Regions:
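A charged, aromatic-enriched C-terminal amphipathic alpha-helix characteristic of glycosyltransferases
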Residues: 124-156
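Short hydrophobic signal-anchor/transmembrane segments that target glycosyltransferases
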Residues: 1-12, 17, 29-31
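Acidic donor-binding loop of glycosyltransferase active sites
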Residues: 51-64, 77-78
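Nucleotide-activated donor-binding/catalytic signature segment of Leloir-type glycosyltransferases, i.e.
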Residues: 15, 22-43, 47, 55
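Structural loop-to-beta junction motif characteristic of Rossmann-like glycosyltransferase folds
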Residues: 58, 76-85, 99-100
Length: 158
């Protein structure tokens, strides 16, 4: 609703089901966002999930992002999540502001809206560049070989 009031219109796809779905559907209706919102539902087919993520311009994870960060970056989709890093899982470190996504102030919907708006203002027309940056982050730092070397360094005291 905040972004729509500013004349910014985005399509939203909710993938998954759960206890919040009815509340989300009510909020979508309240803010007259039905034409731009798709409740896909639960999906456990990796090929379908890959297509959904690959074709998304941005993943917004208002809660703890965890492995979702790895999943979406792996398919070239940047992510936005909250900045309360003590509550986050370690995977939040894959989000590099302005490159592979961004952060918004924890529990602040206005700042979330600003982060989304800022992302699209900065990255409009740069989808392939962003996709490649996401791939590179995963390939360079979030693969078994790199992680194994980090563990070895800890045990070797380096």
């Amino acid at each position: 609703g905040i972004l729509k009031q500013k004349g910014e219109n985005y399509n939203i796809a909710f993938v998954g089901d759960g206890e919040m779905r009815q509340l989300l559907e009510a909020e979508v209706a309240k803010y007259q966002l039905r034409d731009n919102t798709w409740f896909y539902g639960a999906c456990f087919d990796e090929k379908t999930n890959a297509e959904l993520i690959y074709n998304a311009d941005l993943c917004v994870a208002p809660g703890n992002i965890g492995l979702t960060a790895m999943h979406v970056l792996m398919f070239g989709c940047p992510a936005i999540s909250h900045n309360n890093f003590k509550r986050q899982m370690p995977e939040f470190e894959s989000i590099i502001p302005g490159q592979t996504g961004d952060f918004f102030e924890y529990d602040n919907v206005d700042d979330l809206a600003r982060s989304i708006s800022r992302w699209f203002a900065l990255k409009s027309g740069c989808r392939e560049e962003v996709r490649k940056t996401c791939y590179k982050e995963i390939d360079d730092y979030w693969n078994p070989h790199y992680q194994l070397n980090l563990i070895k360094k800890v045990f070797e005291g380096k």
